[in-house]
Amino acid sequence: MPQWDLYVVITTKLGGGRPTLELVRGALAGGATAIQLREKELPARELVELGRAIRELTRDAGATFIVNDRLDIALAVEADGLHIGQEDLPAPVARKLLGPEKILGVSAGTTDEARQAEVDGADYLGVGSIFATGSKGDAGSPIGLEGLRAIRAAVKIPIVGIGGINPDNAAGVIAAGADGVSVISAVIGAADVAAAARRLREVVTRARGK
């Protein structure tokens, strides 16, 4: 059963010039429970090589490994699953090609999108953007905690809050119904990636009453 407490998205260009695997190791050392590889510009061959290395690191750490958007890469590197946005491969097609055993995550910013994703076979939702964020240019207007609460009431599958989340507001995201938080710059943009991940994981763990 995947644990969504701290879901760290790896996008190399936001990592301050550090090697991708260094960012992954730091996030895992700090307690990341899931890692998503989100590289929109790398050639397929490089993505496969990188994905295989991350697969090994996440397996050793007992963390879930998700690939963003690229179904072919997710299958090639034997990732645990795929995450897609509203403009990516349609969820029913992704589910059919992935098969029943792999995890399918879908981004949702409205209750209608969330309900449809659940019907289409999503295993979890990435919900947001909760707060304003500079990490994703396609994040859209923030839905706030009220938007998150509405989506939580609309679906039964796990929800990971996305967008502008940091140690100061993460507890509120959990209180509003999220099962975990997804972050990019709050962890991989930090000077000490492991320490940043550890702090966020502690906040989420306390908020969830674990």
From Swiss-Prot:
Cofactor(s) required, per the database record: Mg(2+)
GO BP field: thiamine biosynthetic process; thiamine diphosphate biosynthetic process
EC identifiers of the protein: 2.5.1.3
Annotated binding of 2-[(2R,5Z)-2-carboxy-4-methylthiazol-5(2H)-ylidene]ethyl phosphate, by residue: T133, G134, S135, G164, I184, S185
Cofactor note: Binds 1 Mg(2+) ion per subunit.
A GO MF label: magnesium ion binding
Keyword Metal-binding: yes
Residues at which 4-amino-2-methyl-5-(diphosphooxymethyl)pyrimidine binds: Q36, L37, R38, E39, K40, N68, S107, K136
Pfam families linked to this entry: TMP-TENI
Entry GO CC: cytoplasm
Pathway terms, separated by semicolons: Cofactor biosynthesis; thiamine diphosphate biosynthesis; thiamine phosphate from 4-amino-2-methyl-5-diphosphomethylpyrimidine and 4-methyl-5-(2-phosphoethyl)-thiazole: step 1/1
Residues reported to bind Mg(2+): D69, D88
Keyword Translocase in record: no
InterPro entries: Aldolase_TIM (IPR013785), ThiamineP_synth_sf (IPR036206), ThiamineP_synth_TenI (IPR022998), TMP_synthase (IPR034291)
Matches recorded under CDD domains: TMP_TenI (cd00564)
UniProt KW keywords: Magnesium, Metal-binding, Thiamine biosynthesis, Transferase
Reaction equation(s) it catalyzes: 2-[(2R,5Z)-2-carboxy-4-methylthiazol-5(2H)-ylidene]ethyl phosphate + 4-amino-2-methyl-5-(diphosphooxymethyl)pyrimidine + 2 H(+) = thiamine phosphate + CO2 + diphosphate; 2-(2-carboxy-4-methylthiazol-5-yl)ethyl phosphate + 4-amino-2-methyl-5-(diphosphooxymethyl)pyrimidine + 2 H(+) = thiamine phosphate + CO2 + diphosphate; 4-methyl-5-(2-phosphooxyethyl)-thiazole + 4-amino-2-methyl-5-(diphosphooxymethyl)pyrimidine + H(+) = thiamine phosphate + diphosphate
Domain of life assignment: Bacteria
SUPFAM superfamilies referenced in this protein's UniProt entry, alphabetically: Thiamin phosphate synthase
Gene3D superfamilies per UniProt: Aldolase class I
HAMAP family per record: TMP_synthase
NCBIfam families: thiE
Protein family according to the UniProt entry: Belongs to the thiamine-phosphate synthase family.
Stated role: Condenses 4-methyl-5-(beta-hydroxyethyl)thiazole monophosphate (THZ-P) and 2-methyl-4-amino-5-hydroxymethyl pyrimidine pyrophosphate (HMP-PP) to form thiamine monophosphate (TMP).
Name of the protein this chain belongs to: Thiamine-phosphate synthase
Organism: Moorella thermoacetica (strain ATCC 39073 / JCM 9320)
Lineage of source species: Bacteria, Bacillati, Bacillota, Clostridia, Moorellales
